[in-house]
Amino acid sequence: MLAQKDAERGILEDDKKIHMRETVESLSADIAHEHWLASKEARELTTTSAAKLPILNTEQLAPTWRSAEPLLVIGARTELDQAAAAIFAALVEMHGVPARVECAEMLTACNIANLDLSGVALMCVSSVDMKTPAHIHFAARRLRSRAPHAKLLLGLWSAKDDETGAELKDVVGTDDFARTFHQAAAIILQRATTDQGGAKAPARASAALA
C-alpha cells in the first residue's frame, strides 16, 4: 500500500497519520451504519464476497462467544494497522459478532497488563505490512500469556500468497492466518459457531514477557 510505504519513509507526518486513521475509522463507522439501515432483502441480493458470509444471531453463537465483545482486533504496530483493524472489526460486526478495537500501544510490555481481555474468545492482530515477524511474535506471546483460552488470528493484509502466510503463522505462533478480510471473517464466523469450552478469566501479565 502506498500510504504504508510513505509512512515507512517518514513522508507521512504524525498528524497526517492520525488524521488518516480517524478518517478511515469514521468511514468504517459509516459503512456499519449504512449496512444496519439496509433492508434484509437488499443484503440478500448483494453479490459482494462479504455478503456471502452468514449473518449470525446471538442464538447461533457458541457460549464462549456470547460476551459483550468476544472479538478483539488490535493494530500490530502502525496507525495504518489500527485503521485496518477498525475497518475489519466493522465488517465482522455486520455479520453478528461484536468486536472491540485496540491500538498497538496496548501490546507493549508496559501496557499489556492493562489490556482488558475479559470475555474475549478470539484476538486478531491486524498488520498491513510485516517486514519481520519478531514484533508480532512478542506481541503474540504477551497476548497468549494474558488470555491462554482465547484463539489468536494474524491478519496480514498485504501477504502475497497463502504459503508465506502459513510460514509466518508458524513463526509467530498464531492459531490462524488470513491475508484478506474475507478469509479472516470466515475463520472468525466459523469459530464463533463451533468453539467449545467455558470462559476463563485472563491471566495476569508476567514481567518475563517484557
What does each of the following model-derived ranges do?
Residues 149-210:
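Peripheral docking tails and interdomain loops at the edges
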Residues 1-167:
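Structured cytosolic domains appended to multi-pass membrane proteins
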